[in-house]
């Protein structure tokens, strides 16, 4: 039996008297999309911060891509992509420069970083804005650029926080198609949102 791409067992995390997680268990197989739904304050962000090595659990165990999120944190960071709710881009760099920079941070060669940047800009319908500084982008364009940054290294596991927040219907459909293409190659995607399932399907 293969090891799940993501596995969490009895995760607990508290902040003072607030219990953010109280025995979380979840599993996602390779090449699937896992949706984590819940209202604000339900612990979704806390769970993902633990799974992406940004926060240590109080107790319990979790592995991502076969690596322990605590013991193998440094190695695991090269195996995941993370696109947050708020676009984390350098406003003074162009769209292409942002993606190339991420590629270099993942130790990709200059030529590979440039090629992947061009491919992602096209898939995310940002080619016409590739040479413009990110500070001139609309909110939706920044969201797409942020997703592109998470995809540059073609990570086996991708975490998405409210992936379609602030996007118009066409951009939402396009973004989900990019995510599905990645999953078809064997990657695993975790999307966490407060939207209900019918709402997600409509957009």
Residue positions per predicted region:
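Walker A (P-loop) phosphate-binding loop of ABC-type ATPase nucleotide-binding domains
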Residues: 39-43
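Conserved ABC ATPase "signature" region
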Residues: 100, 104, 111-129
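Conserved catalytic motifs of ABC-family nucleotide-binding domains
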Residues: 154
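Catalytic Walker B motif of ABC-type/P-loop ATPase nucleotide-binding domains
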Residues: 158-161
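Conserved small/polar residues in nucleotide/adenosyl-binding loops
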Residues: 193-199
